[in-house]
Curated annotation (Swiss-Prot):
Transmembrane domains' residue ranges: 26-46, 54-74, 89-109, 113-133, 163-183, 187-207, 509-529
Role according to the record: Catalyzes the phospholipid dependent N-acylation of the N-terminal cysteine of apolipoprotein, the last step in lipoprotein maturation.
Name of the protein: Apolipoprotein N-acyltransferase
EC identifiers of the protein: 2.3.1.269
Gene that specifies this protein: lnt
GO terms for biological process, alphabetical: lipoprotein biosynthetic process
């Protein structure tokens, strides 16, 4: 009993702190044995406890771990107390799935179903794929393989097999750990050590190969604007005051610069609404572009053109876009890019946040929301975008744009590599969960795309992590972000980002190979149990 408590308690500590933003050491150790210790502890209880008790123990273990991992969601200052209900539903779903999988693992060890154990890493990938692709807009945060992102070599392993490959190898390694603790055979030790080393060896080998061939010859000169507004602060300001602050920040930019990047929904009113008067903004306008003629009323596009004219560069800015469809107003979360030649390209966010940007469940979901959470009953419908976000920044450099947590989905960003984008651009706003871990959690999930696809990235955020990262996941420049101990300050990050890119297996095949493995594994484990059941029935007949 003591060993069971020790194994389960130690596994809880390791997995809880196995977050790249919290502890690199715990993340590495967790990938090796964190879950294996849990399964060994549960296996020790099989003789003295019912399967129901074992499942409940695994459920509460997972519930508490996931509750800690998603604790940033409980910052309710802006999103309201209803977020507790959403948080509880999410971690309960995750706990049910992992507790059930853990019982399957324990059963296979207990009954010595070695053939079934072979399929289990793929089975887990299939389980995670359901929430990654099918749970509302998808839940990409905190997949089992995420602790590998704590090291450069672990992240680089994703360039072969993506998030699914990372989860696969972590489950396989921990199954090896459990077999070591159960059998203590030399073969088990060898298999476990091979699994431990495999992702770091493969990822590290390719990382060092790319690093030796890395080139800084071609760069993109970027100015990333971090306004430093929380959602509440921005809502209390007039649109003219917001622009006055943005222009003031931009005055510190030193030419030459190729592109100025602003965060998600930096200004209100969309691109073409004449919401500004020359008289009210004359002083700011003349400081930005002297001797320029302005109409009495002008738009956000006019502001952006003035910035582009002043700094002779492209400008990318997040804002909302309204569209009237059959008499009904629809809203898009958009990114607007103005090239140096004056061409405007729009990109609409394709993966929307449930609750914040749309109400799941159609009319039925809206009715429930209006009855129980009226403050979240949206008066308009926000639509997902339908087209790719490739924009031309300079004559030679194209960017692939994502908004908010779209960057955490490899399948959503993968087409940009195939469409010959040179750099990734993410516009986001983590200010809805102030003073929480979210900025770093979001950043570490997003930076995986750099090494998965072999592409650099620039991120513009209001209060989160505004940074430039090269194609090997190395931070070229970063601004301070908001945390519990550090308030955020308005600033501009001006940096030259190498646009060196390289081919990856994931960029060529995406998630398809591991999804094939996942489906095959589910069929394999079902076939295994059906075959054993058939043998059992045949034996009983004899």
């Amino acid at each position: 009993m003591f060993k069971s408590v020790l194994y389960i308690g130690l596994s809880w500590v390791l997995v809880c702190f196995a977050q790249p933003d919290i502890s690199t050491l715990a993340s590495v150790i967790c990938c090796m044995c964190g879950y294996g210790l849990l399964w060994r502890g549960l296996l020790s209880l099989v003789d003295s406890s019912s399967w129901r008790k074992i499942w409940c123990l695994a459920f509460f273990w997972t519930w508490s771990v996931e509750g800690f991992h998603f604790s940033w969601m409980l910052e309710d200052f802006y999103v309201g107390t209803s977020i507790y209900f959403v948080w509880c539903l999410l971690i309960s779903y995750l706990a049910v799935t992992f507790a059930s999988f853990s019982c399957l693992v324990v059963l296979c060890f207990r009954k010595q179903y070695w053939g079934a154990l072979f399929w289990l890493p793929g089975v887990w990938v299939a389980i995670e794929s359901v929430r990654y692709y099918g749970l509302l807009s998808g839940v990409s945060f905190d997949f089992i393989g995420w602790p590998l992102a704590a090291t450069a070599y672990g992240r680089q392993f994703g360039s072969f097999f993506g998030w699914a490959g990372q989860s696969f190898v972590v489950i396989a390694t921990n199954l090896g750990c459990c077999s070591v603790l159960v059998f203590r055979k030399s073969f088990s030790y060898g298999l476990w050590l091979v699994c431990c080393a495999f992702p770091y060896f493969l990822g590290g080998t390719y990382y060092e190969y790319v690093r030796r061939h890395f080139s800084n010859e071609e760069v993109l000169r970027v100015a990333i604007v971090q306004p430093g507004y929380s959602p509440h602060m921005q809502g209390a300001r007039t649109a003219s005051a917001i622009w006055s602050n943005l222009v003031s920040l931009c005055q510190g930019i030193c030419p030459p610069v190729d592109v100025i990047v602003f965060p998600e929904v930096s200004v209100p009113f969309g691109l073409h609404r004449q919401a500004y008067s020359f008289h009210e903004n004359q002083q700011v306008l003349e400081s930005l572009v002297p001797n320029k003629f302005w109409n009495e009323f002008f738009t956000n596009l006019d502001w952006i053109r003035a910035l582009s004219e002043r700094f002779q560069c492209a400008v990318i800015m997040g804002m909302e876009r309204w569209e009237d469809k059959n008499g009904v107003m629809h809203l898009y979360n958009a990114a607007e890019c103005l090239s140096l030649q004056g061409e405007v390209t729009s990109y609409d966010k394709r993966i929307l946040v449930p609750g914040g940007e749309y109400i799941p469940g159609g009319k039925f979901g809206f009715s429930l929301c209006k009855a129980f959470f009226p403050e979240f009953a949206l008066p308009f419908q926000r639509l997902p975008g339908e087209k790719s976000g490739i924009v031309q920044i300079t004559e030679r450099i194209k960017a692939g744009i994502s908004i908010c947590y779209e960057e955490t989905f490899g399948y959503a960003i993968l087409p940009y590599k195939r469409q010959k984008a040179d750099i990734l651009v993410n516009l986001t706003n983590d200010g809805w969960y102030p003073h929480s871990r979210l900025p770093l959690v979001h950043f570490y999930h997003g930076v995986l795309r750099n090494q998965e696809l072999g592409m650099p990235c620039i991120r513009a955020c209001h209060t989160g992590v505004s940074a430039a990262v090269d194609s090997l996941g190395r931070i070229v420049g970063v601004l301070p972000w908001e945390s519990k101990t550090c308030p955020v300050c308005p600033d501009v990050l001006q940096v030259s980002v190498p646009v060196y890119s390289y081919p990856t297996i994931y960029a060529k095949f995406g998630d398809a190979p591991l999804l094939f493995v996942a489906v095959s594994s589910v069929l394999g484990v079902v076939g295994y149990f059906l075959k054993r059941r058939g043998k059992t029935l045949t034996g009983s007949d004899i």
